[in-house]
């Protein structure tokens, strides 16, 4: 078996986790108490969904997941909510005081008290696996727990499970909407620390998802539940090939191999289609060509940036539902001719395609329509550097005045860590810039210096 362990850190991680596990349970027909009427092989773990659920002797299916937050309120909602019987109480780990939007508290003072408990729990989960494939880590960049504790945990996971893949699903601070003033600090510190420990990071920004909810689903004032359900669909599409017997794309490492040309350039852009409300879906026939085309429109992306200004290095199209390879090939051929998609010249325009015949499931009473087919596109494009540049600029404005820095130093950080992290991100921006250069330009440029 190729099991995956999900780790949900901080408020964002936990709430996205709730949306994901709710959806997984619906997709696999698992009831909120963990029973699965359709599963006839009790206790034996050779079904595909066993990558995400472990089975107990009594036929209960338990998510291979850990929820961690440094303060209890958000996880308490899980402890008392609909799915309280799904999880083992030890999988829900909470501290007493929160990280107060402070990376240093999450990483140093408060985080280090709880990290061993979490690792111990993860060790127990990994002992139940026959062939652990890796970790999916859900968190936000802006919060104290999401940034500080995640980076601490990733460092420790690298030590304990050196070769296992670690994929992140991270909520990136939105360009306009902000939940904390110090988001740029936390984001840059956490990115710097986790850059070498993460194999692939899928970013979503709240503002982009707000806009999608407003525009496509006609929700005037989207709530976090609306956002998280949409994120849940995306995570479900990415992990569908791990949970169902799919035709293509089955390993976590396959994502990395196909999307990450250089270790540091591991931030693919995610697009999902169709996002459509039930009223509209009734009137529209969404063909493979149509949903594939919508994936290349900037307004359907999960991070605000413009891929028309960047170049593609790699592109993965993960289809699910009623899709046949013939249609996919036709759709891709159409895109290559019609769209001005620019690939870097050192990468032939290959699209990696995954097809899963399980149609997308929706949460009953949710906003999304039940559709026959959907696609999730993961593309590694140099345009995402815009997002980093935006963040770095905000960091610089605050750091020039050393605003708020004393809160971090007071928790045991050194000011040098800020400048070190900032330099690392400057290097990351530069990396993206260089990757986008044509190979001829790059080689020619080097020659002139001497």
From Swiss-Prot:
GTP binds at residues 11, 71, 140, 144-145, 179, 206, 228. GO terms for molecular function: GTP binding; hydrolase activity; metal ion binding; structural constituent of cytoskeleton. Its EC number is 3.6.5.-. It is found in: Cytoplasm, Cytoskeleton. SMART domains: Tubulin, Tubulin_C. Mg(2+) binds at residue 71. It holds the Pfam family Tubulin_C. The active site is at 254. The modification N6-acetyllysine is found at residue 40. It is an enzyme of class 3 (hydrolase). GO terms for cellular component: cytoplasm; microtubule. Acetylation of alpha chains at Lys-40 stabilizes microtubules and affects affinity and processivity of microtubule motors. This modification has a role in multiple cellular functions, ranging from cell motility, cell cycle progression or cell differentiation to intracellular trafficking and signaling. It comes from the Eukaryota. It catalyses: GTP + H2O = GDP + phosphate + H(+). Keywords: Acetylation, Allergen, Cytoplasm, Cytoskeleton, GTP-binding, Hydrolase, Magnesium, Metal-binding, Microtubule, Nucleotide-binding. Belongs to the tubulin family. Tubulin is the major constituent of microtubules, a cylinder consisting of laterally associated linear protofilaments composed of alpha- and beta-tubulin heterodimers. Microtubules grow by the addition of GTP-tubulin dimers to the microtubule end, where a stabilizing cap forms. Below the cap, tubulin dimers are in GDP-bound state, owing to GTPase activity of alpha-tubulin. This is Tubulin alpha chain.
